[in-house]
Regions:
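Sec-dependent N-terminal signal peptides of Gram-positive bacterial secreted proteins and lipoproteins
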Residues: 1-28
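Generic detector of low-complexity/intrinsically disordered segments
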Residues: 11-20, 55, 205, 225, ...
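Deployable pore-forming modules of oligomeric membrane-permeabilizing proteins
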Residues: 26-152, 174-194, 201-202, 207-212, ...
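Membrane-insertion modules used to breach or fuse lipid bilayers
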Residues: 133-189, 228-229, 233-260
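Solvent-exposed, conformationally flexible loop/turn segments
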Residues: 158, 197-200
Length: 260
């Protein structure tokens, strides 16, 4: 059998790389069957945090194209959206540099995982040890409980960082998230739990939370005007690793534990 010429082999090998395998689709965030929404049953009306992303205006979008540093901070976008620059040609040689502040510009997510039993919020006991027929127990929230998350480290502009992280976590999990959520007293569910005679059981309820980890990017933002041209300049760009716990709003994880 004749050997394949080396040049032909290299060509064929190179051509094989032109065909790319289809990328594996991102798997949806899996929620266990033990987790249930209580948005309709909750006696405390939590305010929704799932706000639509603020879109840059025509001027803001034009300015963003002048810098290679990604900007996702909604407060900075809003400030630029509310600004206006006259279209009248400025004097030849005119130049101005306006310092807009040091901002948390963007957040890159590295890991998003859930703790479905982040905080125990309620326990209902069903004692049927003295009974001779099956009894039914249900979840009833005994008292109002506030569940809070937060950043795992101190960083500059913490509120902006929390907003950036929550936006990314909501996009990845498709869950309603908030750094503070409340389960109101008297909240109930219709689902029944059966306890046999001579038995007892406990129904535990937990508030789930998302653990978000990634990197936040900071930078000093300047608006530079020169003649009739305008651009954004970002200086002293730094990045910092950060994590956060973000509770899942109006959701509970239920655990039913039987005992003799």
């Amino acid at each position: 059998m004749k050997k394949m010429p080396r040049i032909m082999f290299v060509v064929l090998l190179s051509l094989s790389f032109l065909y790319s395998f289809p990328a594996e689709a991102a798997k949806p965030f899996k929620v266990p069957s033990s987790v249930a929404s209580i948005s309709k049953e909750n006696t405390y009306p939590n305010a929704s945090q799932d706000q639509p992303l603020l879109q840059p205006s025509e001027l803001t979008a034009e300015l963003f194209k002048t810098t290679s540093v990604p900007i996702e901070n909604t407060h900075l976008i809003k400030m630029l959206n509310e600004s206006s620059i006259s279209g009248t040609p400025l004097a030849v040689g005119y130049r101005a540099t306006i310092f807009l502040g040091r901002w948390a510009l963007s957040y890159d997510s590295n890991e998003t995982v859930a703790n479905w039993e982040y905080k125990k919020v309620n326990t209902n006991h069903i004692d049927n040890r003295g009974g001779n027929k099956t009894v039914i127990g249900k979840y009833v929230q005994k008292q109002q409980v506030k569940v809070s998350g937060g950043l795992t480290a101190k960083v500059p502009n913490p509120e902006d960082v929390k907003t950036l992280m929550m936006q990314k976590a909501i996009q990845k999990t498709k869950l309603p998230l908030a750094f503070d959520t409340v389960i109101g007293a008297g909240t109930k569910r219709d689902q029944s739990y059966h306890v046999s005679p001579k038995k007892a059981a406990s129904l535990h309820a937990y508030a789930p939370a998302i653990n978000e980890k990634g990197k936040v990017t900071y930078g000093e933002v300047y608006l530079v005007l020169k003649g009739n041209k305008r651009k954004l300049v970002v200086k002293n760009v730094t990045s910092q690793g950060i994590g956060a716990w973000i509770p899942v709003q109006d959701h509970l994880t239920f655990g039913f534990q039987g005992m003799n």
